[in-house]
């Protein structure tokens, strides 16, 4: 692969004089001893260097190449060759890490004086610095330390490698404060990749690009934190006229692309400026591109305008990536003349109009087509059209393809990824479909109205790792699954029957399972393996499906006790069994066996018994919804001690994909949350509509990051605890329909984010506290059914009835109280004048402002009169 890359980047292979092993000369003893000493300092868990044995010819060792002529070691290639990941990512990652070399790179290698090729990539050297002695290999022409876990500063001694042609330091944790001092000395360098090397600390680092060797043909500075205006780049005045490939993506460049940027780079074939903050017109930019550009990536910027008609003359283009900009207008049909085009990504723009056969007329080599999220883009082709291409990757989501299922897909037998979500298809899935996509790995037909009985088995899709058919009209039973599957979403369909026992043996790789909103019935399979497979001493049940992290069976008719199936799912972070017919008690093992659980949704079932206090051990629990069950007992103080609800930082390491939804009843309405970002910010405790008794524990005030608290519809008694004022993040509080008594605590006014409150139908008494956020609640119904409450916003007056009044601010005597109200009045007047004064000079502002004042004046007046009455009553009493 290295030789292919060198040829592609026009680096003469002959210039790197590595000779194949197999010659008659054996290696030099001094060099063999040096290699053995190197091996002794290296960590090699998978025994990659097992062939390196004392007394044997080192020229025949793995990764070692000697010169046929001299016997000197000239090449050392110890890169981790396990770099191809298939369907089981977790298993592959374990194998990949197991094959990594680590430890110390000892200076014994200096004995190999004739080394001209060194590759240590894809290993892990534990963030150690790159050894300075590497700069002593005077004959080195090829150095690859990418993805090797190095850290710290790049040693300037690398500047001594004056014969170096290829240098790759990418994707480590490196930084370079003074790369200006050593890079220009590499006068023969043709290939330089310093991607993800932090260059932000380099003094005048952007202008230092002018000092790069003129010999460079490939320059990759991807994600180097250069952070500058693009106009400050000196590339247009530099001597990098031989550049063939240039990537400056993810560098926080901003502003327009200057006219002369690419003036001298007439040989440029690849240009990557993706994920910056560039502005400008796409048509003007394309005028400046070199005539033989082959790969252009301007994605994730702020480019505007329409694609130019002259695009059809860029006949060398192989890959065009313009996604996630603000492009508009029509896609020119001349794009169909780009005969070399292999990849086209125009997704996430504002493109519109019709896509026809003409747009693809001569695209015989096209393999990647991404047009998603251009909501006004419609594809209209003849039903009998057979495309000239064989696509592998297709994403047309949120384009208009319907109402009929696109028949041209029938010819695309090489498809690996097929995404046609939300495309307006209202049709029956064709008979030929499953045969055509037999090689698919990722299938998404969600958010359409596609109908058909699901096949009894999907095992023939042996390569598939994700299938998403949610929100369609599929019916039939749950099909048998393939062993490779990681994500299955059949939610919002009409799937019937039971969850088959066969799933237990066919979900070994499954991580996300969503069968919610269907018509499933019966009990979930327990999926226990033989008793020999788990250890009774520790109770560690080994269950098939232990990789599951997200499971939703909500809105079905499933029954039975809490499924024992989940007992071994130690990575589970999202579990939704709500709106079913599950019964029995909640198992205490939830708190121990599911340590990663962040969302537990069991609403609207028939669970009974106590709420196990072991749930408090779930450190990452953000949402607990046990509403509408038959749970009884008290709310134990230890139960309201969820770590993730007490501190801002306890979010855990979980991911919920966008297509997984979560229903939360908050602010008096049921809200459905979809995206991972919103779900991860939600914190909710809902125990409503059960049979809970006793007091609300004072410890509940420690849940400082809780946003939604609903304890309504129980039989709770006692006071509302004063500590409730500690819920400073609370937005919704519902304590209605209980048997709470006593006064409403004035600390409730501390909840400055509170936007929904319901205390109705309790036995609360006394004055409704005012101040801060509570003054915004002017709907008397939130206090309805508490006959002994008085004060705004209800009509019952608190003054003159002989009742002992309690209110938020209490003082020793009337003089202090009078001073307080006098001070408050003066502050109010001064503050009001500071606001109103400027308004007197701006007529439109003053009109709007005083109209607002008129609306609230009555409320302020009533508030002041009421407090004055309280003052007089208190003075008389004393």
Predicted regions and their residues:
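Plant-biased, solvent-exposed loop and capping regions
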Residues: 1-878
């Amino acid at each position: 692969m290295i030789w292919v890359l060198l040829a592609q980047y026009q680096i003469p292979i002959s210039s790197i004089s590595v000779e194949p092993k197999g010659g008659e000369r054996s290696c030099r003893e001094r060099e063999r001893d040096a290699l053995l000493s190197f091996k002794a300092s290296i960590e090699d868990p998978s025994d990659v260097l097992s062939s390196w044995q004392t007394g044997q010819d080192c020229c025949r060792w793995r990764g070692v190449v000697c010169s046929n002529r001299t016997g000197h070691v000239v090449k050392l290639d110890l890169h981790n060759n396990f770099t191809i990941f298939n369907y089981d990512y977790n298993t592959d990652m374990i194998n990949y890490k197991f094959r990594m070399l680590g430890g110390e790179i000892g200076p014994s290698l200096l004995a190999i004086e004739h080394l001209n090729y060194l590759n240590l990539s894809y290993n892990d050297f534990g963030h150690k610095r790159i050894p300075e002695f590497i700069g002593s290999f005077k004959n080195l022409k090829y150095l690859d330390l990418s993805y090797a876990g190095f850290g710290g500063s790049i040693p300037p001694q690398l500047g001594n490698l004056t014969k170096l042609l290829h240098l790759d330091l990418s994707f480590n944790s490196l930084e370079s404060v003074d790369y200006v001092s050593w890079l220009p000395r590499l006068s023969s360098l043709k290939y330089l990749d310093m991607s993800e090397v932090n260059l932000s600390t380099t003094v005048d680092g952007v202008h230092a690009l002018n000092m790069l060797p003129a010999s460079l043909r490939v320059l990759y500075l991807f994600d180097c934190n250069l952070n500058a205006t693009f106009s400050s780049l000196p590339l247009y005045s530099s001597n990098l006229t031989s550049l063939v490939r240039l990537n400056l993506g993810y560098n926080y460049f901003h502003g327009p692309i200057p006219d002369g940027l690419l003036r001298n780079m007439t040989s440029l074939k690849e240009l990557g400026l993706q994920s910056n903050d560039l502005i400008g017109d796409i048509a003007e930019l394309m005028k400046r591109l070199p005539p033989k550009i082959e790969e252009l990536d301007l994605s994730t910027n702020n480019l505007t305008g329409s694609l130019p008609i002259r695009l059809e003359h860029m006949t060398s283009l192989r890959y065009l990536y313009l996604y996630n900009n603000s492009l508009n207008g029509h896609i020119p049909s001349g794009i169909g003349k780009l005969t070399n085009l292999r990849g086209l990504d125009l997704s996430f723009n504002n493109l519109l109009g019709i896509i026809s056969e003409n747009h693809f007329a001569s695209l015989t080599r096209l393999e990647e087509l991404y047009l998603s999220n251009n909501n006004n883009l419609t594809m209209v082709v003849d039903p009998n059209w057979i495309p000239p291409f064989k696509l592998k990757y297709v994403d047309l989501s949120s384009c208009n393809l319907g109402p009929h299922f696109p028949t041209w897909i029938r010819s695309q037998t090489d498809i690996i990824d097929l995404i046609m979500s939300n495309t307006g298809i209202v049709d029956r899935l064709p008979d030929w479909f499953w045969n055509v996509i037999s090689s698919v790995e990722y299938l998404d037909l969600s958010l359409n109205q596609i109908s058909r009985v699901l096949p009894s088995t999907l095992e023939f899709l042996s390569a598939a790792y994700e299938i998403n058919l949610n929100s369609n009209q599929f019916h039939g039973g749950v099909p048998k699954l393939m062993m490779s599957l990681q994500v299955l979403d059949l939610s919002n369909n009409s799937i019937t029957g039971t969850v088959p026992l066969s799933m237990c043996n066919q979900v070994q790789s499954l991580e996300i399972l969503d069968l919610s909103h269907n018509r499933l019935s019966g009990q979930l399979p327990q999926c226990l393996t033989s008793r020999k497979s788990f250890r009774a001493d520790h109770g560690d049940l080994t269950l098939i499906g232990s990789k599951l992290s997200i499971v939703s069976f909500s809105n079905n008719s499933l029954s039975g006790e809490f499924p024992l199936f989940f007992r071994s799912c130690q990575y589970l972070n999202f579990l939704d069994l709500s709106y079913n017919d599950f019964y029995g008690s909640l198992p205490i093992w939830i708190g121990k066996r599911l340590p990663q659980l962040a969302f537990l949704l069991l609403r609207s079932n028939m669970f009974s018994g106590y709420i196990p206090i072991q749930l408090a051990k779930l450190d990452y629990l953000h949402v607990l919804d046990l509403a509408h069950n038959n749970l009884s007992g008290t709310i134990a103080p230890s139960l309201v001690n969820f770590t993730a609800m007490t501190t801002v930082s306890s979010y855990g390491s979980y991911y919920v994909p966008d297509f997984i939804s979560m229903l939360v009843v908050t602010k008096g309405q049921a809200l459905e949350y979809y995206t991972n970002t919103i779900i991860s910010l939600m914190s909710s405790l809902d125990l409503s509509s059960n049979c809970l008794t006793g007091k609300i524990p004072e410890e509940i005030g420690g849940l400082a990051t809780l946003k939604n608290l609903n304890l309504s519809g129980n039989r709770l008694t006692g006071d509302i605890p004063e500590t409730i004022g500690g819920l400073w993040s609370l937005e919704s509080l519902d304590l209605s329909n209980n048997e709470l008594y006593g006064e409403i605590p004035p600390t409730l006014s501390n909840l400055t984010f509170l936007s929904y409150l319901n205390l109705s139908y309790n036995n609360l008494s006394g004055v409704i506290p005012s101040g801060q956020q509570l003054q915004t609640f002017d709907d008397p119904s939130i206090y309805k059914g508490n006959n002994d409450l008085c004060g705004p916003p209800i009509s019952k007056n608190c003054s003159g009835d002989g009742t002992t009044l309690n209110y938020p601010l209490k003082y020793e005597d009337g003089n202090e109280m009078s001073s307080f109200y006098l001070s408050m009045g003066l502050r109010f007047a001064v503050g009001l004048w500071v606001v109103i004064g400027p308004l007197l000079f701006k007529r439109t502002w003053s009109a709007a402002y005083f109209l607002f004042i008129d609306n609230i004046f009555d409320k302020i007046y009533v508030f002041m009169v009421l407090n004055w009455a309280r003052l007089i009553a208190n003075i008389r009493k004393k």
